[in-house]
């Protein structure tokens, strides 16, 4: 059973995982270490601890912004890829997703990793109209959700339905598709809907729009905007806000 970890111990835990794997691989006869197998075992151990957590959300953990005892709500949780670590570490977790099958999967995950949490914490609802109360969590996650908005009105409803869940001084972590860095590579479908080179259609934001939204929400950037350009396919921007009290 994995014990509680504070953010400052996360890097040490990853190192220990590699050490444990190497010790398992060394054997009684101290045979030569198979490095590929060692690190494969380490990655299995890390995957068990962290799941498939978004690397930029992991960065927030390492920087101490999401600490033990905080309430965390995943708005658009999918099958729970970002929740494994938080469930293992006894955070107070809630989640919402419009897909009932996804919510059933998250309830099953929580039942194994955090059976003390009530199933009512995990709800099959649209993020724009969830039944969670205002100021429900210290940290609200919106990872790869908002770019599925049908149009501007839907985007605004999803965003504001998510933002209202953040407590005063709380953290809003969002990753969403954008046009930043590939402005000329997208085909407009009207409004902010675009066809992407990877064959998908998305609602895309840009830097001026995100800054305008930040001001309109009454938030403050916790980090500068960060955008990852996936070679000639799409762009994903990390938008992290603090809710000003």
Enumerate the predicted regions with their spans.
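Short linear motifs in low-complexity or flexible loops
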Residues: 3, 14-21
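Class I (Rossmann-like) S-adenosyl-L-methionine-dependent methyltransferase catalytic domain
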Residues: 35-67, 73, 78-129, 171-245
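A short acidic, Gly/Pro-enriched loop at the edge of an enzyme's catalytic core
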Residues: 128-140
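A short SAM/SAH-binding and catalytic strip from SAM-dependent methyltransferases
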Residues: 139-153
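A short glycine-rich, Lys/Arg-flanked "PGG" loop and its adjoining helix->strand segment in the class I
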Residues: 156-168
């Amino acid at each position: 059973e994995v014990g509680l970890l504070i953010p400052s111990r996360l890097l040490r835990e990853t190192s220990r995982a590699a050490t444990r794997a190497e010790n398992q691989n060394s054997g009684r006869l101290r045979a030569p270490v198979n490095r590929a197998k060692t690190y494969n075992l380490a990655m299995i151990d890390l995957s068990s601890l962290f799941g498939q957590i978004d690397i930029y959300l992991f960065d927030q953990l390492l920087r101490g912004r999401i600490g033990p005892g905080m309430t965390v709500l995943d708005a658009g949780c999918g099958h729970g890829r970002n929740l494994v670590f938080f469930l293992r570490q006894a955070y107070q977790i809630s989640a919402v997703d419009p897909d009932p099958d996804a919510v059933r999967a998250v309830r099953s995950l929580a039942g194994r990793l955090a059976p003390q949490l009530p199933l009512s914490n995990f709800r099959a609802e649209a993020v724009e109209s969830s039944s969670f109360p205002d100021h429900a969590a210290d940290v609200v996650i919106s990872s790869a959700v908002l770019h599925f908005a049908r149009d501007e009105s839907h985007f605004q409803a999803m965003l504001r339905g998510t933002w209202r869940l953040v407590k005063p001084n709380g953290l809003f972590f969002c990753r969403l598709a954008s046009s930043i860095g590939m402005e000329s590579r997208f085909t407009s479908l009207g409004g902010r809907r675009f066809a992407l080179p990877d064959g998908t259609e998305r609602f895309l934001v840009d830097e001026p729009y995100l800054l305008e939204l930040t001001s309109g929400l009454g938030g403050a950037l916790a980090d500068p905007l960060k955008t990852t350009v996936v070679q000639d396919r799409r762009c994903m921007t990390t938008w992290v806000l603090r809710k000003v009290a």
